[in-house]
From Swiss-Prot:
It is found in: Secreted. It comes from Homo sapiens. Its main location: secreted. Expressed by the liver and secreted in plasma. May participate in lipoprotein metabolism. Belongs to the apolipoprotein C4 family. GO terms for biological process: lipid metabolic process; lipid storage; positive regulation of triglyceride storage; triglyceride homeostasis. The keyword Cell membrane does not apply. One of its GO terms (cellular component) is extracellular region. Residues 1-27 form the signal peptide. This is Apolipoprotein C-IV.
């Protein structure tokens, strides 16, 4: 059970890492053609063909992903997302926390007073 709990705790960190990697990939300039060419001897080997094909497929996926997420990384869209998140989740956090704290304090004082012996705390009616 603890293994499952650890996996669930690691999920937000993993999502953050993927988001950072996507941002880095989107911000990097396009690679110039012909910068990394294999030596002539390795050009026709099977592994170089597999590596070349995988590179083509991955570049296609990365470029499509970058193009698809480009709208999100524009300043106005990201600012709008953060403003909406703040409005939905964080705006009322201060007053809600203060109200919860005061309510919890009052409840705790009532419970403590009800458990307190009359000789130590005195009678409620005398107060």
């Amino acid at each position: 059970m603890s293994l499952l709990r650890n996996r669930l705790q690691a999920l937000p960190a993993l999502c953050l890492c993927v988001l950072v990697l996507a941002c880095i990939g989107a911000c990097q300039p396009e690679a110039q053609e012909g910068t990394l060419s294999p030596p002539p001897k390795l050009k026709m080997s099977r592994w170089s063909l597999v590596r070349g094909r995988m590179k083509e497929l991955l570049e296609t996926v990365v470029n499509r992903t970058r193009d698809g997420w480009q709208w999100f990384w524009s300043p106005s869209t990201f600012r709008g997302f953060m403003q909406t998140y703040y409005d939905d989740h964080l705006r009322d956090l201060g007053p809600l926390t203060k109200a919860w704290f005061l309510e919890s304090k009052d409840s705790l004082l009532k419970k403590t007073h009800s458990l307190c012996p009359r000789l130590v705390c005195g009678d409620k009616d005398q107060g």
